[in-house]
Amino acid sequence: AVIREENEHWSYRVNQGEIESFGKAYIQIYACDECDFERLLLRLVKQASRNGAAQIHVRDNTGHLKIGYQAEYFSFDTSYNQWKLVKTTKVDSKTNGVAIQAVSLDTSDSKLVEEYCNLENECFKQVPGGVKRTSKQLLLDIAEGERCFSLCKGDAQVGFFSAKKIKNEETGEEFFELESLGVSEAFRNQGIGKEGLLMFEQLAAENGYEKLSMICADSNPAIYLYERLGYQKEKMLSTWYTTRDKKRDLYEQENKQ
């Protein structure tokens, strides 16, 4: 599912593991000679399209790719940036009045682990950069320090969040990072997302963390909630461009008529 290649002309990484689940492929071009860029880009996006990707995300570290870039029948018309957001811990005792509990995920119960993954994957299906996580990967991430919580309303699991301690290798500063936060579609617009964020902040304060962080795309509507609650953009981590196979889209449209 993951292809890597590096030589004297280019260096790239392609993740096609999300095609079956989300219809997405992710291409990262780290280096490429300008004279070879379009040829390499076309080869990679065509390969992803042939393998079933309806939407192709490309991160270009070379600076060659811009909005409006055209390569045969692929045009790169939209983009989004991934940002690191930060906030100093400040616990707000105010809640939304929503009767929500945060329940630590019981990793010994395989059914609960699977249900957690299913909800997480469903929530992230439309999120920019969203990737599918298997039960096996979730358990590996937990073993490496990630803490996962189900947001429950009565007996119903209505959402989730996960967090992990992150250390800045350059400064030695420690952050408590929000790894994920999501709400089931049937329970959205009820203040549950905000409630989950406040619970994350409470958990950070209880464990003595002074700095909070998260990574979020500026095309993700949730970023407006985070900014309203005091999170600030500290650093832009990457820019991603999106494209589709317009030739395949036209073919599929004609065959539906």
What role is predicted for each listed range?
Residues 1-48, 161-179:
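Conserved donor-binding loop and adjoining core beta-sheet/short helix segment
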Residues 56-60, 178, 212-216:
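Conserved hydrophobic beta-strand within the GNAT/NAT acetyltransferase core sheet
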Residues 62-80, 194, 206, 218-236, ...:
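Conserved active-site alpha-helix within GNAT-family acetyltransferase domains
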Residues 81-103, 210, 215-220, 232, ...:
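C-terminal "cap" of GNAT-fold acetyltransferases
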Residues 32-101, 240-242:
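Acyl-donor-binding surface of acyltransferase catalytic domains
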Residues 1-8, 127-154, 162, 168:
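Active-site rim helix/loop that mediates acceptor-substrate recognition in acyltransferases
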Residues 1, 95-131, 252-257:
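Short amphipathic alpha-helix that is part of the acyltransferase structural core
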Residues 34-46, 180-183, 189-202, 227-228:
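Conserved acetyl-CoA-binding loop-helix of GNAT-fold acetyltransferases
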